Amino acid sequence: MRTLFLIGLLALGEPALAAAPTRLTEPAVRDFVGRQSKAWNAGDLGRYFALFAPGATFTDQGRAKDGRVVPYGTSTLAEARAQTRRARAKSKVAETTLISRIEIAPDGRSARVVAGEQIVLTTAGRARHLCAERVQTLIATPAGLRSKGQTDTYGPCR
């Protein structure tokens, strides 16, 4: 019965089910990260946060001069949305994402993405340059690729 239901949905052109990849590929992962960056830089927070799974978490941390990682905090998806809205009300943010590594799981259903982030944060006409390493895990869902969240580790720009 469930099979007939799924076939019926596909016959009706249900885009959510049709969007789920059977195996992740590097080009699909790169495209996803590109869509994230485009939505973020356009300030389209609805589109940006729609690319995350409901249980996604967002962790910020810093790297001390001696190499230690210093945790700043972790937010839920709802908390990250609210924090981003507040921050963007005061500042303009532009990020450049440079993917350094993509590791696709053997089953092809998830991928770990490591990227460098070059960030320009402009507040009251003053620009600050920040750099971070971002690590996120992408998963294949019936709605397409989604991120389980991200960990940004801020450190010196090189």
Language model features with spans:
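A mature extracytoplasmic/lumenal domain signature
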Residues: 52-55, 62, 115-119, 136, ...
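Hydrophobic/aromatic beta-strand elements that line small-molecule binding cavities or substrate pockets
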Residues: 80, 97-103, 117-119, 133-140
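N-terminal signal peptide c-region/cleavage motif recognized by signal peptidases
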Residues: 13-15
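Positively charged n-region of N-terminal signal peptides that target proteins for export
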Residues: 1-4
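Short, low-complexity N-terminal intrinsically disordered segments enriched in polar/charged residues
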Residues: 17-51, 74
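Short beta-strand edge/turn micro-motifs at domain boundaries
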Residues: 110-114, 124, 128-158
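A solvent-exposed, acidic/Ser-Thr-rich amphipathic alpha-helical stretch
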Residues: 50, 54-103
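Hydrophobic pocket/interface hotspot
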Residues: 36, 48, 56, 80, ...
